[in-house]
Curated annotation (Swiss-Prot):
Organism expressing this protein natively: Homo sapiens (Human)
Name of the protein: Coiled-coil domain-containing protein 194
Keyword Lyase: no
Annotated region (Disordered), positions in chain: 44-67, 187-234
Annotated signal sequence range: 1-42
Gene: CCDC194
């Protein structure tokens, strides 16, 4: 990446200095040209004097304003050289400023490209966020359905467990009744065992044998109560 260019205030000051230097150089060149013309006209000699004027002046002496004009011409030449040096410095600074300006333009172009890339990435991120929001909504709806199904399954399981408990209690009660009936049956059998030793008359042909008290007791109202199998809980 290019180095940062000079500050804007400094650049304007340098440009103003360049303008002033150019103006002073032009003024100095104009002054030097005027002084040169005056010196040249003075060197060519004065106009023809009137008769009797300056009769006492020596013929080899220069006019009175030539030395002053030569001094002013030398000063103007020095100022012109100084202004030329300043102009060269201003030109060098101008080249540096142009170089810095090109570097700034290059940086601006790269920053613009990066900004465009960031905008594209931001748009893509927004699109992905919208898609993820829709997917999250669908997942939330599915989760709600699953929770409702799980709640219904839990309710059914609780109902089944409750029914299993009721059936188990009924089975235990039935088993208790069956045990009581068996105990009573055993007592009756014990009481009837002496009566079995007495010989009974043979039944007539065609008549059905009367059922024994044991068979009647076994075919009682209990009907062989069976204990229901326990269901595995949860």
């Amino acid at each position: 990446m290019a180095e940062p260019g000079p500050e804007p205030g400094r650049a304007w000051r340098v440009l103003a200095l360049c303008g002033v230097a150019v103006f002073l150089a032009a003024a100095a060149a104009g002054g030097a040209l005027v002084a040169w013309n005056l010196a040249a006209s003075a060197a060519r000699g004065p106009r023809c004097p009137e008769p009797g004027a300056n009769a006492t002046a020596p013929p080899g002496d220069p006019p009175p304003g030539v030395d002053d004009l030569r001094r002013r011409l030398a000063e103007a030449a020095e100022r012109e050289e100084a202004l030329a040096r300043q102009l060269d410095q201003a030109e060098s600074i101008r080249h540096e400023l142009e170089k810095a300006l090109k570097a700034c333009e290059g940086r601006q172009s790269r920053l613009q490209t990066q900004l465009t890339t960031l905008k594209i990435e931001m748009d893509e991120a927004k699109a992905q966020g919208t898609q993820m929001g829709a997917e999250n909504g669908a997942l939330t709806e599915a989760l709600a359905r699953w929770e409702a199904a799980a709640t219904e399954s839990t309710r059914r399981l609780d109902e089944a467990l409750r029914r299993a408990g009721v059936a188990e209690a009924e089975g235990e009660a039935c088993a208790a009744r069956e045990a009581a009936l068996r105990e009573r049956l055993n007592v009756l059998e014990a009481e009837m065992s002496p009566q079995r030793r007495v010989p009974r008359p043979r039944p007539r042909s065609g008549s059905r044998p009367r059922p024994s008290p044991r068979s009647r007791s076994r075919s009682g109202p209990s009907g062989g109560c069976r204990r229901p199998a326990r269901r595995a809980r949860g």
